[in-house]
Amino acid sequence: LGDVYKRQVLSNATQIHRDSVRRALLRVDNNILKLDSAFDATVRRMNNPQSASYTVRGIVEAMKRFDGRMILQTMFLRGECGGQPVDNTTEEEVSAWLRLVAEIRPQQVMVYSLDRDTPCPTLEKVTKEELQAIAARVEALGIPCSVA
């Protein structure tokens, strides 16, 4: 079946610092790792990582160990959750995220927005046009980018 179907794994990337996890992910055809912001505070609002030691820098350093053999996936959204504003589409957010993309050098980037209801009904989907503008900036780095 491996000759006919590609094996894909989507991971929140919180365990990729572990050698056993990294080795396993390198064995699949499409190793898709999530990173939704360049800022710890935004990631905490969006994803609520359970590890107190989670840092974007730690995830980025672990992603770099894949030497480009990964696909980076990022969800863009805006709104409010738990009384806190969240928006990873601002120029500050996108520019900082693009610097990390350039540092990680994944084989591909996938950008998308909300596609179903969330626990926070005040979160808003980002338009396809906004996602395409972000994708164009990724492609300007020489990295293919798809919009979903």
State the predicted function of each range.
Residues H17-L26, Q84-P85:
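Distinct, well-ordered alpha-helical segments
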Residues A62-M63, I134-G142:
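Alpha-helix-loop-beta-strand connector modules within alpha/beta enzyme cores
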Residues L1-Y5:
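Short, small-residue-biased leader/transition segments that mark boundaries at the very start
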Residues C81-R105, L123-R137:
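Short, electropositive alpha-helical surface patch
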